[in-house]
Structures are given as structure tokens and as C-alpha cells.
Amino acid sequence: MIQSKTKLLPSNRELAQMCSRAGISDAQEFFPADSGGFNSVYRVSTAAHGIFILKMSPRYGAPVLTHERNMMHTELTAYDLIRSHTSIRVPRVIFSDFSGKCMPCDWFLMEELEGCPLAQMPRDVRQSPDLMRALGEATAQLHAILGEGFGYEQWGLRGSWRDAYLEMTHHIIADAKRLGAEIPCVREVRETLRHFERELDVVKTPCLVHFDLRPEHIFVRQEAGAPLFSAVIDPDCAYWGDPAGDFLLFDQQSAFWEGYQAAGHALEWNRNLQLRTLLMQLYLALIHYTRVEVRLEKNSFLYRREKWSAGHEIKRTLRLFRDCAK
């Protein structure tokens, strides 16, 4: 299990009590899952009901970033929407408890999905055109789910994407200051946001954006020796707004775009979309730079490595903005 200060370390007795509350009385073994750096995740084996996944938020009152508060509520809402409005497979949630009675955190129990994360597959499999095309189609289905406002559901929605995005970036910069994290080139970050914020006004419709479509969150299964897209997990970072937030890893994947447009989304990779994607890339880099303050032991090797990597990404993204401004 990835070490993080936000993760709870329940005893087997506490885990068994949670399963019992969820109606699973034959839990036998609990295995920490190597999943994520925020929530605690355990695989639960049972005598007669297969394997389940138990997921716990940080302890109530634990230091977290502003946008991380109540993220588990967002995850379950997104699962319901995806299940109801698309053909995308997501885990079936067996039970959820946000009362704090059993554990001082939000938690839920869900089924274990068939297949494995794309991150566990060889690189050539990850780049399979058929797989990328299917992922493009699935992403287009996500973006066809429309909301009533912009931003994070847990904050309350805004009337425009520009207002929502500026609020998101304001909070992460304020979090960094509160936690003593000195964002590199912060003045240039602010100037860049002011200079390019008008590019966001083209986004008129709030669509559901996963915003964490990493290979770890994309499930695949093998059929006749070929990898097939199977499911999506962990939409706890989801927001309503610009679909560009889901293009960060796929801008060079032509097969992804083929699938996305085949599903009815005609998007042109033009200067505006490039700038909007860079704005989301900058926001994500700011998150990565700041979140280590609440997750990792200060000055540990992992802390320094993540800090350096995120700082490098901030500077790289600013260089790309400067190139666009020429």
C-alpha cells in the first residue's frame, strides 16, 4: 500500500465490523491494495461471496486540500451517473456509510472488477490503437453527461466555466500558501492565468469530466489475446466543465481521437483547445506540487522526488504557454 499521512490503518477487527455493517458476515482476509495516495483501500476475501473492495476516506478533520473535501461523495455520485447514462462498466457499490458511526471516516464497499488496470500491461499494449479507440468512445460517453453548472459538485456549482476554473486555481494556490509550499514562478502562474482565462469562455456546456484517466484507473481484459477496454474507476476528482481535463494524456493519440469523434463529439485540436488543455495541465501540476504537504513526510525521499517532479511540470507548462504567446 502506498504510504500517505491521509490514509487510515484500521485493524482487521475494525475492517470485519465494517464488512458486517455492509451485510458481509463471512469476510476472511484483508489485503491492503496498492492503490492511490489519498484513500485507504483493502481487498476483502470472503468464504462464499467472492472478493470485494473496501475504500475509506481520510479521517474526519484530517488536513487535506480544499478540493479534496468530501471527494468520496463525488465518486459515488459519478458512479451513479456513469452507470445510468452510459454503457461504461463501473464497480457496483454494495454499501456506503457516511455517518461516522463505524469508523471516523466516509467509506464504501464495492465489487472487484474483472480484468486489471492498464498500468499493469506492457507499454505496447497500452498504445494499442483498438484500445485507444475504445477509450476515446468511452470518454465521449462521459462527456455526454451534462450538469446544471460548472465546477466541483462539493463546492456548489458556478454559472460559467471561467468562474469555476478561477475558483479552482485560487483555492489550490491558497492551499499552497497555507501549507508553506512555495510554488515556483508563482507570479508568472498568476499572470498566465489572467492572460489566458478568456480562452475558457468557449466552454458553454458543463459536461462530466473524470479528470484522472490515468492507466491505473482504466481496466482492461484479455480476449483472444487482445486487450479490450473493460471499465473505469476512481472518478473522485470529477468536475463539471471543460472536457479538456480528460485530454491531458491523449493529445498525441490519434486512435483516441478517432474513437472520441466517432461517438459524436466533433472536436478540432486547435489553438483554443490546446490552451485550455494547458490550463488544465497547469492546474493539475499545482495540485501535485501542493498535495505532498498533506500526504508525505516532509523532506522524505518520496516528498522531495514528487516536489521536484511537480515543480518541473509547472515550469514546463509555463514554457509551453510562452511559446503559444509568441
Predicted regions and their residues:
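Hydrophobic alpha-helical segments that form the core
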Residues: 277-290
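Short beta-strand segments
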Residues: 53-56, 92-95, 154, 208-211, ...
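Active-site Asp-x-Gly
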Residues: 206-209, 214-278
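Short helix-capping segments at alpha-helix termini
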Residues: 23, 85-87, 266-268
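An alpha-helical support segment within catalytic cores of ATP-dependent transferases
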Residues: 11-26, 98-101, 108, 114, ...
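ATP-binding pocket architecture of kinase catalytic cores
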Residues: 31-166, 178
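Flexible, glycine- and charge-enriched loops at secondary-structure boundaries
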Residues: 8, 65-72, 125-132, 182, ...
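ATP/Mg2+ or Mg2+-diphosphate-binding catalytic cores
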Residues: 2-5, 288-326
